[in-house]
């Protein structure tokens, strides 16, 4: 009899005061019989410029060329929360993990997709929820044409355009270490770190269509700001590199991570 592969630990990024969000995501995970752990998120209300300097140095407080502005306190808090998980994975010698933010909806297929990925451990990073300048969260970012069946309608393939959203992804500890090095000094939001993962040396894949989407009930009250606000500036560069001809080549598998160069 084949023994089912162990699922990676699921870390839910959640602030202590975000009780409604915690209940929202906990109920969904319980409904799919998935164990999880709440990772105490850094609260932007607890951050001061002095604290940020002590934790991250001066760079995080400076205007960022690609953004055209400083990082917001919410973006810094979110980035720190994801960094903490990457470091914990290394400290605790985990093989891999799933990172979930608390303001998402899990599709009924989420658990089955995770089990299928766990049964075939060959990916460094897989975006479970994502969107792009071209497509919304129910379609997801563009991926290469060569796709492997994961479960039902869901396929996994290399990402070939800037994927927005760090709200749901699988990552190995080796890839998490590369992302942590790439993220410092902090100069970009968390979903730029994941979106431009190829620049850190990580082979990035995505599930299409995504099996996790932003929860509409929480979109208006995001602590970070609009999920697309930070990406809007960066996508001017993405579009220059990502014209239709270049995208077509990347979809065929020719340098699919080329969109991330320069970040």
Language-model-detected regions and their locations in the chain:
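An acidic/histidine-cluster motif and surrounding catalytic segment
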Residues: 1-100, 104-263
